[in-house]
Amino acid sequence: MEEDIDTRKINNSFLRDHSYATEADIISAVEFNHTGELLATGDKGGRVVIFQREQESKNQVHRRGEYNVYSTFQSHEPEFDYLKSLEIEEKINKIRWLPQQNAAYFLLSTNDKTVKLWKVSERDKRPEGYNLKDEEGRLRDPATITTLRVPVLRPMDLMVEATPRRVFANAHTYHINSISVNSDYETYMSADDLRINLWNFEITNQSFNIADIKPANMEELTEVITAAEFHPHHCNTFVYSSSKGTIRLCDMRASACVTGTPNFLKEPEDPSNRSFSLKLSSSISDVKFSQQWEDIMTRDYLTVKVWDLNMENRPIETYQVHNYLRSKLCSLYENDCIFDKFECVWNGSDSVIMTGSYNNFFRMFDRNTKRDVTLEASRENSKPRAILKPRKVCVGGKRRKDEISVDSLDFSKKILHTAWHPSENIIAVAATNNLYIFQDKVN
């Protein structure tokens, strides 16, 4: 990545594009696999679409960042909880890949209540010549079998199959907001509003409760769990965030189940900022460990913060995402925008941070140069392999030609979900029902 992020030239391309969107088409999860060769998206209709990267050729260097549809399958269906008279949406809340161990790929997907483990594999041969079955798979009468045949494998068109290998259900009373694969690759955790459960991939009927903040009296409830993630290298360590802006680092060696809500990382409250809207805006919507350093990144409504695990009382870095909205928090509360859950991601070297905003804008912050840039993902100003231009939001009355007034922002167009290729400067951005790929300019 170039040092001057303001002058960076970025190409973009569409991956998924609908001229008209239904509620089911809205993308709700985006995730690269560990190599970056596959990119998975989930939507509110319960579908998972997997894209595969085009093989690079010497004659088509400009296509090095292009992805095509690899597999599509229905992960979750709408359900109804008859005991509680509640509808369970099919919406995919999170997708997490497992490291590839063989020719097949494995991923976790979850809706509000159920986590599923999927196997995605290729098949280019089919068996023929069964003795007890005919060519259509029907059983043959043994009395008609006069010769013994040896089954053989015949070539066939490549078929990508997605099959559910495990279904992890009936363990969450509240809505699941996070799943995270442990670094031992044998376990993973799922977090809802009040509890975090630890699962073994081989056991579907039992999980262990490793965090519980539910009070004895629900009238005393003051916060909920908003996000959780395992440490990328230490299998005993995980972190979770809360709606009060607190971050709790937990060690499973110290306690089998973390109870209560003690503060671990939290910025002191500003006595001058005690309004109800500002308290809501301090709720953390995403938390991520860095890959290279002992840092944690959090996203609240207005900012992205980076925390050093050795400094509990303040973040070491704070980046303003859309500070121009601070004066509009009351109206954003009235239209429920203040409850939007924005995600944040690191690049492969943890040197650049990316997160979304409104009007289909997304922000990038270079931690080394302290430069930032606002870019837009939209069909109106973007064509495949076009170069994106930085955008600026004007707060005052006067604005330049290339600026947009804060009063003109479209709050129905929001980028909540983003993903960064693990080793290259290729990013995926979900803008409502459209998926965009961006990459550094190819010379």
Swiss-Prot record:
GO terms for molecular function: protein phosphatase regulator activity. InterPro entries: PP2A_PR55, PP2A_PR55_CS, WD40/YVTN_repeat-like_dom_sf, WD40_repeat_dom_sf, WD40_rpt. WD repeats lie at residues 22-61, 87-128, 171-209, 220-260, 279-317, 334-375, 410-442. Brain. The modification Phosphothreonine is found at T298. It is found in: Cytoplasm; Cytoplasm, Cytoskeleton; Membrane. GO terms for cellular component: cytoskeleton; cytosol; membrane; protein phosphatase type 2A complex. The modification Phosphoserine is found at S275. Keywords: Cytoplasm, Cytoskeleton, Membrane, Phosphoprotein, Repeat, WD repeat. Belongs to the phosphatase 2A regulatory subunit B family. This is Serine/threonine-protein phosphatase 2A 55 kDa regulatory subunit B beta isoform. It comes from Sus scrofa. The lineage of its organism: Eukaryota, Metazoa, Chordata, Craniata, Vertebrata.
